[in-house]
Design a protein with these regions (language model features):
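C-terminal-of-GTPase-core extension/linker across diverse P-loop GTPases
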Residues: 2-8, 12, 143-260, 280-282, ...
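A glycine-rich (often HGG/GG-containing) alpha/beta subdomain
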Residues: 1-145, 149, 153, 329
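Short glycine-/small-residue-rich Rossmann-like dinucleotide-binding loops
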Residues: 240, 275-276, 300, 307, ...
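Short, Asp-centered acidic motifs that coordinate Mg2+ and/or phosphate
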Residues: 269, 301, 329
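Switch I (G2) and immediately adjacent beta-strands of P-loop GTPase domains
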Residues: 52-63, 68-72, 252-280, 298
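Inter-motif core of Ras-like GTPase G domains
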Residues: 285-309
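Generic enzyme active-site microenvironment
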Residues: 271, 305, 331
Length: 454
């Protein structure tokens, strides 16, 4: 990391300001070549967390006015000397300022290189680095909160608690076994069980957070299904907030799957409005119906729509049967009309039932609550730490299984050496999660998803 790197850190386009970030041992030297403060004070002589207003000059020509923010190592984002130049937000001007910085001795930063340097310099662990990209890409309040809590150490604190407990246990076991001549107190089975049970509870809690975390981060693959003209497209439009699906009184209008992503309460739903489920001789419509039936078997949430003013038919009953195979909310639509539907039968077969008028919006709040309940939002507590990706989940799961192996070894009377092997495997998995012990390939894969300038 001998190079001093630079990149535009704000989004491309025209705006009030743009920020060019420079990081590395020579950050101050590079910037002093092109930044001339109005008080003639060099950035290299300024204290950290201070700012200076001045001119950007290249080849003796003034390019722009700018504010330079100075951060001294190690008290900066990257842990290195950092300068952030805030100039006017024009596309051409911003690129001109960056070119001047590069001409002064900096090199272009790679994607995610600033955050990668923060990781390599011990400012953040790998889970916190992954949280940075999650903050940037968050599509809902819950997703942003969850990512921010991870960035501030919610997952790391849990991992450190388990890691330190297991390290202490393994060290005590090894010392007692290797130095019998020393006056080292023997570890009791009760102490070992306590250590394992506490570790298992914490790791189990993190594993449980994963599904809710994915629901708020990636969204739930959700299918709207029902027979023709029950109001599926109207429901799709209600949730989308716009006329996304065609709404008519003609059965079979929706022949293919229409997709949209919406935020319902604090949950992201990846919605699919499917063809009406019915027996048909129309070849094109039949293809749509077959696709709908296939899709609803694979979804993470089924919104099964029924018509309040029509009696149940065989297609409705087939849908009710499918509802037992996936998480489901039964939506009794058109409640503004006269009742003909056997709602008691539906309530006896499907746990979550919501009464709604998709046309007027009455009942929408109840639908939002039902979606949040199915997504586990009642138990969703970002401050407790939320695993945000499969890499983290697998590392915690591996550690959990190793702790369970250690507990099982104790229960069947294996030696302390055998127990210690499982404990050490559990610790290794946790170190892989934090990045304290992991391959360069894994690290590179994490930062590959970042944008340039972050």
């Amino acid at each position: 990391m001998s190079d001093t790197i630079a990149a535009i850190s704000t989004a491309q386009g025209e705006g009030g300001i743009s920020v060019i970030r420079i990081s590395g041992d020579s950050a101050f030297t590079v910037c002093d070549k092109i930044f001339k403060g109005i008080n003639n004070k060099k950035l290299a002589d300024m204290k950290g967390y201070t700012a200076s207003f001045g001119k950007i000059v290249s080849d003796g020509e003034e390019i722009d006015e700018a504010v330079a923010l100075v951060f001294r190592e190690p008290l900066s984002y990257t842990g290195e000397n950092v300068v952030e130049l805030s100039c006017h937000g024009g596309i051409y001007i911003t690129k001109l300022v960056l070119r001047a910085v590069l001409d002064a001795g900096a090199v272009p930063a790679q994607a995610g290189e600033f955050t990668k340097r923060a990781f390599l310099n011990g400012k953040i662990d790998l889970s916190e680095a992954e949280a940075v990209i999650d903050i940037i890409s968050a599509k809902s309040r819950s997703a942003a909160r969850a990512a921010l809590c991870v960035k501030e150490g919610a997952v790391r604190n849990k991992i450190d608690e388990v890691k330190n407990l297991l390290l202490s246990t393994a060290a005590h076991l090894s010392a007692w076994a290797d130095y019998p001549e020393e006056d080292i107190a023997e570890v009791t089975d009760e102490q070992l069980y306590d250590s394992f049970d506490v570790s298992i509870a914490i790791l189990d809690g993190l594993i449980s957070s994963y599904d809710s975390g994915q629901a708020v981060k990636q969204g739930i693959d959700t299918v709207i299904a029902g027979r023709p003209n029950v109001g599926k497209s109207t429901l799709m439009n209600l949730l989308s907030g716009c006329e996304r699906s065609i709404v008519t009184d003609i059965p079979g209008t929706t022949r293919d799957i229409i997709e949209d992503t919406v935020i319902v309460g604090d949950v992201i739903l990846r919605l699919s409005d499917t063809a009406g489920l019915r027996t048909t001789d129309d070849k094109v419509e039949k293809i749509g119906v077959d696709r709908a039936k296939h899709r609803l078997k694979q979804c993470g949430l089924l919104l099964a729509v029924f018509d309040y003013d029509r009696s149940l038919d065989d297609d409705d009953k087939e849908l009710i049967q499918s509802a037992g195979e996936v998480p489901c909310i039964a939506i009794i639509n058109k409640t503004d009309l006269d009742k003909q539907l056997d709602t008691e039968y539906i309530e006896s077969k499907i746990k979550n039932v919501v009464y709604l008028s998709a046309k007027s919006g009455d009942g929408r709040a109840e639908l939002v609550k039902a979606v949040e309940d199915i997504a586990g939002m009642d138990n969703f507590n970002p401050s407790e730490g939320v695993l945000s990706n499969e890499r983290q989940r697998q590392a915690v799961l591996n550690s959990l299984n190793s702790v369970k192996d250690a507990k099982n070894a104790l229960e069947i009377g294996l030696t302390y050496d055998a127990i210690t092997v499982s404990i050490e495997e559990a610790i290794t998995s946790l170190l892989e999660l934090t990045g304290e012990r992991t391959s360069d390939e894994v690290v590179d894969r994490v930062f590959h998803n970042f944008c340039v300038g972050k």
